[in-house]
């Protein structure tokens, strides 16, 4: 029996269905002498995947599916993985275009899907003419997950660190993304940058969905596979996980931008451009540099490196 350890930190609002899918997959694989063990991270579990992998005693998995982007973007974490990864990017054909171009991270990470962040607003005309860096009073949320971090990194790369600081100073930043959505519903803010699944609840009379002028801000997820298992099995697992069934489910139920080309349905937020930090810029950003700014402006933010110190 071949044992495979998969770490999973993905789409929390669809997690019940994700778990049902993975339970069924694990059961099917048993007939082929494959024992799939899935360890879950994120909302509803004790820790995020990046927090666990940062620990000195962390056990490395065979496979990862993660929208916790610090796993891949924090060089102090990714260095534990990047010397033992297969070139998975070529294993599954993906839909080309600006949505994919924005999230490419090299040959060792296979883009799975992206959560598009768009405006949920009472002021659509202002949204149409306001750059992401120019907002005063914008709500957005997810302090200790990838949502706020990606917005901050996007602004930082395009407009500089001072622009990122100003955005945090002038915004209503909530613990989780739905908190920003609720801030607009409760009229604590006029506009929120939220997952499109929330913004689609706009009634078209008092509240509206508006794509940012720069395009949606993308929160991507990636699949990667370590050389701890044979390549043939790793490749099979990529195809089993990024299968038409799960991809179509994500597109239909989450309004997610799903990259495998066999996906039949597209997100309504696909656009001529998109915002996401680039791989070369992320490679230059140090842990200390990012978290110094981030934690200084957001007292609720946690820095795993500081948390590990005795």
Regions picked out by a protein language model, each given a short descriptive name:
Residues 71, 154-212:
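Ligand-binding pocket segment of bilobal, Venus flytrap-like solute-binding proteins
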Residues 82-92, 109-110, 205-217, 226-228:
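Short beta-strand->loop
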Residues 118-125, 218-232, 249-253:
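A bilobed periplasmic-binding-protein/Venus flytrap-type ligand-binding module shared by bacterial periplasmic
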Residues 48-52, 179-183, 234:
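Short, hydrophobic alpha-helical packing/hinge segments within bilobed ligand-binding/sensory domains
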Residues 1-75:
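Early extracytoplasmic/lumenal segment of secretory-pathway proteins
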Residues 23-30, 118-174:
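Ligand-binding cleft/hinge of the Venus flytrap
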Residues 53-54, 60-63, 79-118, 137:
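A structural signal for short loop-to-beta-strand junctions that line the ligand-binding cleft
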Residues 232, 240-310:
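Extracellular/periplasmic juxtamembrane helices and adjacent flexible linkers that interface
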